[in-house]
Regions:
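Extended, low-complexity cationic-aromatic segments
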Residues: 1-92, 206
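Short, solvent-exposed loop/turn segments at secondary-structure junctions
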Residues: 28-31, 69-71, 111-113, 138-140, ...
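Acidic, metal-coordinating catalytic cores used for nucleic-acid/nucleotide bond scission
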Residues: 82-84, 106-118, 136-142
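C-terminal domain-tail junction helix/linker
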Residues: 167-211
């Protein structure tokens, strides 16, 4: 419920006006860097787009993204590994531009790199100014950054052809700026506290848990 409450407050701008920032963060690990053996043939009259099925692998990329909930702007960085050791410094870089904020609410899922002993100790060091909110188990869809990653991947990565890992990383960083210029906007989140409570109270057999 806390996460939904913050999303609803964004619509009234009340949280931002108090000098507080809400940021969602998520990772998309192990994105395959694939080089197609033949160029993709673009769509034309009477013919769908054709993509070569044979490819050469050039490793993987771990994409971490942050979503500034108030304005929908995207922050992106590619990590060498998808683990807590690389996640924690990335969080510092994500939060760095908001040194002016009285408080930052960071929404993340329950991934192992987010809940390890070292990462939890790291979050305690940042507390109380940095308030971490975990999505419920199997509730990562409540994290708006997950929706951002899906939309970003479909628009900028889905039909990619990469001759090296470095080229894909540079494309992601360049595309972040393009996304912020052309598409960034606050998400309209339909799943409200009221809808959640109605569902909770009218669905038999549910196991109650804190959200």
């Amino acid at each position: 419920l806390k996460i939904l409450w913050y999303y609803e407050r964004i619509e009234t701008r009340s949280v931002w006006q108090r000098g507080e920032v809400i940021i969602c963060a998520d990772e998309k690990p192990n994105i395959q860097v694939l080089e197609r053996m033949m160029p993709t043939q673009p769509m034309r009259s009477g013919q769908i787009e054709r993509q070569e099925f044979e490819y050469k692998r050039h490793g993987t990329v771990n994409l971490m993204t942050g979503l500034i909930v108030y304005n929908g702007r995207m922050w992106a960085e590619c990590l060498d590994k998808n683990d807590g050791e690389h996640f924690r410094p990335a969080v510092r870089r994500l939060l760095h531009p908001y040194g002016w904020a009285k408080r930052i609410h960071l929404i993340i899922d329950n991934g192992s790199s987010h809940t390890s002993d070292d990462t939890m100790a790291f979050f305690r060091e940042l507390s109380p100014r940095i308030h971490v909110l975990f999505t419920p188990v199997d509730g990562s869809w409540l994290n708006q950054a997950e929706s951002l990653l899906e939309a970003f991947g479909e628009r900028y990565l889905l039909r990619g052809n990469w001759m090296s890992r470095e080229l894909m990383i540079q494309h992601i960083l360049d595309s972040q700026s393009d996304y912020n210029q052309r598409f960034a906007h606050p998400f309209q989140w339909e799943w409200s506290c009221r809808k959640f409570l109605y569902w909770l109270n009218n669905t038999p057999g549910l196991i109650r848990c804190k959200t």
